[in-house]
């Protein structure tokens, strides 16, 4: 089935990581986030994939070697407008729409492809924070955004299997927030067809930096543990650890997987890497450095005697020797972070720093 993957947005809640990189291209288990979505779609039955691009579109276009098509959304005016941008690439047949910044479990996604018309649902304890599905038996009758009194615990995952006729239903008006919403198209589909809810066993919306950590905690254990780089006989690697070609793991290094060491990365000597960690291509982790449960992106250097925990470091960051990241609240509360001016609960007891691209610290920074 033909599939539209939405990847045009900048992802402002993921800033400053997205200052130079579109959110769907952030790294998850050694690959861009959106690549996981495309691969899962193909596995589920996608025969033609159209990726809608916008912000920093060249980065996405240059990455994909698999046969996909691209459609450009000139202005980011909402999900409905994004799909409208892709219609010229579609035949007059049913189609699936997926968010390029979300992870879906493959078995549930296959069920969505087989069930359509359908919408992916996910059961949560706080539905008032999401778009919530209205249901009547085994049919979806509509969706309501962030209701004070949710009609159910089933939220909208942003995964849709639409009938062919929905290509003509994209002329909806703007919502109160000034965007063309795909949920308005879903509402019309519910009125015109029997739309079924497909319950997803696992789903993750990767919208904020700590959710990038969660995405890697999900996907890193699925890797095959290939070790094609140079690993010293005096290093100890335990669990699922990928070492890409050109990477060097020096004497005295201990890596407790799941972990991913990217192409041409350098680790050690005597460094300690543990807990769902990515060290991207061309990264350097120096002598006696500990990196725990973190994403360290391309070209970043962490100087000797440093500690990085539960953090996300953007591209080409330089941490001076002795830089120490705090990541724990001792009152046992979860960490709260300011996102676009609002204090947001990460629901994580440990969360460190989010460091934008090209940032530098001096020695002994904490």
PLM ranges: what are they?
Residues 104-177:
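Conserved core of the sugar-phosphate nucleotidyltransferase
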Residues 9, 101, 123, 208:
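Active-site glycine-centered loops adjacent to acidic/histidine catalytic or metal-binding residues
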Residues 95, 158-159, 204:
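A residue-level structural signature of the nucleotidyltransferase/glycosyltransferase Rossmann-like core
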Residues 218-220, 255-261, 267-361, 365:
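Flexible, glycine/small-residue-enriched loop-and-beta-strand segment within the central core
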Residues 176, 188-275:
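Extended, small-residue-rich solenoid/repeat segments and analogous flexible loops
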Residues 11-15, 128:
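Short N-terminal binding/cap micro-motifs at the start of the first secondary-structure element
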Residues 2-5, 13, 26-27, 31-99, ...:
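Conserved N-terminal catalytic core of the sugar/cofactor nucleotidyltransferase
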Residues 24, 67-69, 139, 194-196:
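Conserved beta-strand segments of alpha/beta enzyme cores
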């Amino acid at each position: 089935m033909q599939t539209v993957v939405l990847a045009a947005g900048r992802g402002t809640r993921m800033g400053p990581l997205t200052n130079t990189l579109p959110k769907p291209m952030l790294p998850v288990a050694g690959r861009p986030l959106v690549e996981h979505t495309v691969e899962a779609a193909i596995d589920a039955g996608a025969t033609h994939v159209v990726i809608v691009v916008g912000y920093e579109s060249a980065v996405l276009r240059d990455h994909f070697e698999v046969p996909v098509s691209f459609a450009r959304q000139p202005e980011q005016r909402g999900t409905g407008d994004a799909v409208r941008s892709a219609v010229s690439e579609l035949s007059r047949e049913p189609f699936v729409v997926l968010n390029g910044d979300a992870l879906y479990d493959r078995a549930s996604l296959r069920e969505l492809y087989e069930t359509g018309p359908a919408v992916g649902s996910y059961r949560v304890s706080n539905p008032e924070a999401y778009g919530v599905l209205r249901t009547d038996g085994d049919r979806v009758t509509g969706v309501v955004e962030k209701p004070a009194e949710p009609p159910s615990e089933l939220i909208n995952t942003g995964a849709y299997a639409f009938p062919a006729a929905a290509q003509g239903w994209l002329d909806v008006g703007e919502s109160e927030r000034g965007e063309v919403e795909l949920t308005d198209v879903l509402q019309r589909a519910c009125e015109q067809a029997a739309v079924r809810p497909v319950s997803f066993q696992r789903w993750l919306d990767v919208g904020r930096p700590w959710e990038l950590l969660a995405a890697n905690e999900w996907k890193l254990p699925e890797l095959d543990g290939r070790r094609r780089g140079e690993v010293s006989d005096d290093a100890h690697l335990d669990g699922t650890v990928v070492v890409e070609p050109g990477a060097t793991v020096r004497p005295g290094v201990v890596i407790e997987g799941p972990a991913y060491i990217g192409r041409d990365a350098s680790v050690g000597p005597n460094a300690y890497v543990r807990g769902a960690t990515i060290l991207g291509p061309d990264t350097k982790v120096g002598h006696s450095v500990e990196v725990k449960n973190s994403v360290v992106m391309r070209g970043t250097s962490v100087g000797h005697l440093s500690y990085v925990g539960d953090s996300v470091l953007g591209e080409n960051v330089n941490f001076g020797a002795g830089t120490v990241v705090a990541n724990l609240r001792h009152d046992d509360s979860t960490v709260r972070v300011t996102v676009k001016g609002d204090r947001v609960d990460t629901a994580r007891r440990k969360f460190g720093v989010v460091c934008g691209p090209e940032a530098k610290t001096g020695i002994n920074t904490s």
